[in-house]
C-alpha cells in the first residue's frame, strides 16, 4: 500500500511513518516541516494543509490517508492559525483525498471533544455528548463532522479516532517537553501558569520554589490529585494501524488510549523516588483534571491491546532522564 501520513514531522506521525516503512509499505509525508525520514520508499510534501495544490500533490496516487497532523495550542493568540490548520486544513486534505479516490481516511481527533476534563459521566465512552470547552476541542469536533460528511458523500471509507493524551516515554521526565514539562515540573509549570495569566496559581507555585528543579504533584482545590490518561506513542500507533486495515473500523468512532488512567498520587512519588528530585504538592483553584476514558470499543471491535502502561513508560523515562544528567 502507499499511505499518506500527515503530521509526518510530529510525534505520532513520524513514528507511524517509520513503522509503515518497516512493514514494507510506501509512505508519503505531508507536514509544514521536513520529517528527516530517509528511505527510498518515502517521499514528502512540505506544505500547509490549507494549501489545496499541496494537499492534491500529497493525495495523488495514495491508497489511504492517516490525517495525524494538526496544530495544538491553547493560547488565544493562536486562534486563527488553529482553525485554519485543523478545520480548513482538514476539509482541504479530505477533499483532495476524495478527489484522488483514496480508499480509507483515518482522522486523529481528541478526547477534548467530550471534554474529558469535565465529563458528565465516567468512564467516558464514545456515547458521551461531544461538548468541547476549548477552541482546540471545537476544531477537532468540526474536523470529525467534515470527515463524517465526506464519508456520506464519497465512497471513501472513514475512521475517527479520539486520541488520549499521548507522549513518547522519553518525554515524561523532560522538563523541556511541551506537555510533560509543565505537567510534572515546578519551574515549567510556573512559566505555563504565568502564560495563562493564572495569578493565584503562580503565587501558590512560587511559594513552593526552593530554587532548584522539583517535581510537582498537582491537586484540585479540595486536595484531590489529578488523574488522566497518558498513552505511549507506540500504543497509539498500534491503534492507528488497526484503523487503517481492519474491516470493522469503517465508519467507526473509537476512543484510542491506555486502558487505565494515571493517578498523579501514584506516579509523582514514583518519579521522585527514581530520579531523586524533590517533590512538592500544590492545590490549584478549580475542579482540576480527573477522568477515566473507556477504550472498550476499540479493544472489543478491533482487538486493540495496549502494551505500554505508565509504569513501563516510566522505566524508559528514567533511563532517558539519567542519560541527560551525564
Ligand atoms: P505534534 O505536534 O507532534 O505533530 C503535529 C504535526 O502537524 C507537526 O509536525 C506540525 O508541523 C504539523 N502541522 C501542524 N499544522 C500544520 C499545517 N497547517 N500544515 C501542515 N502540517 C501541520 O502532534 P502529535 O502529538 O503527533 O499529535 C498527532 C495528532 O494527535 C494531532 O492531530 C493531535 O491534534 C492529536 N492529538 C494529540 C494528543 C497528544 O497528547 N499528543 C492528544 C489528543 C489528540
Give the positions of each predicted feature.
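Catalytic helix-loop patch of NAD(P)-dependent Rossmann-fold dehydrogenases
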Residues: 84, 119-160, 181-184
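Conserved Rossmann-fold NAD(P)-dependent oxidoreductase catalytic core, especially the SDR/UDP-sugar
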Residues: 92-135
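NAD(P)-cofactor binding segment of oxidoreductase domains
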Residues: 65, 77-105
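Amphipathic terminal alpha-helices
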Residues: 310-326
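NAD(P)-dependent short-chain dehydrogenase/reductase
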Residues: 149-228, 233-235
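NAD(P)H-binding glycine-rich loop region in Rossmannoid oxidoreductase-like domains
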Residues: 36, 47-85
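N-terminal Rossmann NAD(P)H-binding glycine-rich loop of SDR-like oxidoreductase domains
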Residues: 3-23
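Mid/C-terminal beta-alpha module of Rossmann-like enzyme folds, strongest
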Residues: 227, 235-285
